[in-house]
Amino acid sequence: MKIVVLKFGGTSVGTIDKIKNVANIINDYKKNKYKVIVVSSAMKGATNDLVRKSREICENFSDEEYDVLVSSGEQVACSLIAGRLIKKGIKSRSWLAWQIPILTEGLHKHSRINNVNRNKIIRYLKSGGVPIIAGFQGINKEQRITTIGRGGSDASAIMLAKFFNAKRCIIYTDVEGVYTTDPNKLKKAKKIKVISY
C-alpha cells in the first residue's frame, strides 16, 4: 500500500475555511492513489483555552484529568475534517487514540508512544476510507488517556508514519522547518538543518 501521513497543525485547521482547504489537500492525495492517514492538532488556540480553564478550576489540576481535558481539542478538529470529507463524497471518520489503540508509556502530560495497533486502520484504509486521527494523545496500560506534551501531534504523525511504513510524512505548519523553539515567539529560534527521530 502506498501510504502517506498528512499532519495538519492548529493554524492549518484554525477556521472552517482552512478545514475546507485541508479537505481539498487530502482529496488531491486520494486522486493520486495514496492511502491517506491524517493526523490533526486542535484548532488554533483551543488547547491554550483548555489549559487556562484547568488553571481557573484549581492551580494544581490533576495531571490525569489534564490529559483528558486538553486532548479534547483534537477530537473537535478531527470530526470537522471528517465531516467535510464526507460532504465531498470521501469515506472518512475520526479516530481517537483509544479506538485504534495508540499505546503510550510514561508520565501524564509527557508520555511517549510505544506501540500502535495497526489492524483497524489498515482495514479502514483497504476499504477506501481516510482515517482522521487525533494527534497528541494515546492510552496507557490502565486505559487512561495520556498526552505526549505540547507539539505532540507532530510526534504522533511521525510515529504513525513509522508504524504504518508510510512512503511520506508531511507536516503542514505555519513555519518553514523545525526550529529550536517557536520562531513565532522567540526571534532567536534557530532552524535545524538535519534531524532524525
Each predicted region: which residue ranges?
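Nucleotide/pyrophosphate-binding catalytic subdomain
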Residues: 1-197
